[in-house]
Swiss-Prot record:
Protein name per the record: Polyamine aminopropyltransferase
Originating species: Salmonella paratyphi A (strain AKU_12601)
Pathway: Amine and polyamine biosynthesis; spermidine biosynthesis; spermidine from putrescine: step 1/1
GO molecular function list: spermidine synthase activity
Cross-referenced SUPFAM superfamilies: S-adenosyl-L-methionine-dependent methyltransferases
Role of this protein: Catalyzes the irreversible transfer of a propylamine group from the amino donor S-adenosylmethioninamine (decarboxy-AdoMet) to putrescine (1,4-diaminobutane) to yield spermidine.
Amino acid sequence: MAENTMWHETLHDQFGQYFAVDNVLYHEKTDHQDLIIFENAAFGRVMALDGVVQTTERDEFIYHEMMTHVPLLAHGHAKHVLIIGGGDGAMLREVTRHKNVETITMVEIDAGVVSFCRQYLPNHNAGSYDDPRFTLVIDDGVNFVNQTHQTFDVIISDCTDPIGPGESLFTSAFYEGCKRCLNPGGIFVAQNGVCFLQQDEAIDSHRKLSHYFSDVGFYQAAIPTYYGGIMTFAWATDNDALRHLSSEIIQARFHAAGLKCRYYNPAIHAAAFALPQYLHDALSAQ
């Protein structure tokens, strides 16, 4: 792709978004997908896979803080964390901020994503790949969760949309495998698209996850890069109390962890589980 052109996202047929390409840093096909990293004056460095924006330097902190701190602080004493996907390293960066976590395993199907993001998105990983608690596994996420002998307290599915390599991370086989290697009282979370435009994804995930977990729901965050409204995150656990912890408990855990965030705070944590009525109605109609 030439510089000083417009890059158009291809996720939706009838509408979408575009970014001015000021400088192409990398554009190649990896073993699994088309990967481009370019610079944009408004959003900094932008990474897209197969024509869909995955992350930008300007607003990635919202996504990664919410995917990480909500489940980890709700759990309260997570020692072992599994990240599925997350090759840009930002999810890992946020998990490493929790000093009580003892092991962090990241399973990424595409070694190319990890390699090129380390080089071209250094602010995302911020050196977290060198954390001694971290182990990288290059494997398919479904295969890993169904074969591993490890167990985890929190599983974060930092998946792409349910197309291409990411499609398998929205299947019953994946959810069943996650339940299999999740410790009692553990929490599973996953990105679940922009529910106003991708409502069927949320409905499908809710239906499938409900076969394996007693408490299934969603929480949300407004992330400008993800076109169409508020990003939805799936939540699943067998500890029904964790989604309804008091603000005092979350506040105490937040301060004990010593976190300083740019988006997440205990009030946001509680508010994130308030869902729009159209999503309640859609889930009730299943």
